[in-house]
Amino acid sequence: FMEWSAAFFKTWKPDEVTIAFDPSVRYYLYDAFEGVNYELDVSKEPGHRIKNLKWPNGKAVKDTDTFVVAGNNYRATTQMLTAADIFLPGEDLPKLLEIDVRGDVGGIRELLGEYIRTVKGGTIEPHVNNNWKIVGNNWKAADHQKAVQLLREGKLALNENADARTLPGKAITTAEIAKF
């Protein structure tokens, strides 16, 4: 499942100074994962990108370890519990523990809203725990910063996709920033 989600990124090439996204993958299909620490190596081809997968205590995740994965009904019924993109026909599918879990409050959206109102006092403070990072993008920091500056100044642009459900599929290259 993690490798499937990591295919959202294009494979990084040595002349690139930004990361690009695969325009054939809708951005709402990208999932980040909590409860584990990991690296996503964009220099590797899809299917071989998740590296250094560890539990929060630092112990390596083993092939025999099991996970409890919570997801909304859309992700469960379109990817997690069907033979298609993640699991091939004939492979064992994950065991469904519960479906359409609803309390007195309602579904996942309502449960999250109730949690924010009652436990967090109506406000949540964003917090990044840095349990994952992108690696394999071995650009020179100065080249990357120059690309960021040129993008902010409007001197360079990432391609605009006709479809608002995708992110830019083009990376900025060293040749492009060398023109400035």
Where are these regions (language model features)?
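Extracellular/lumenal glycan-associated surfaces
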Residues: A175, K179-F180
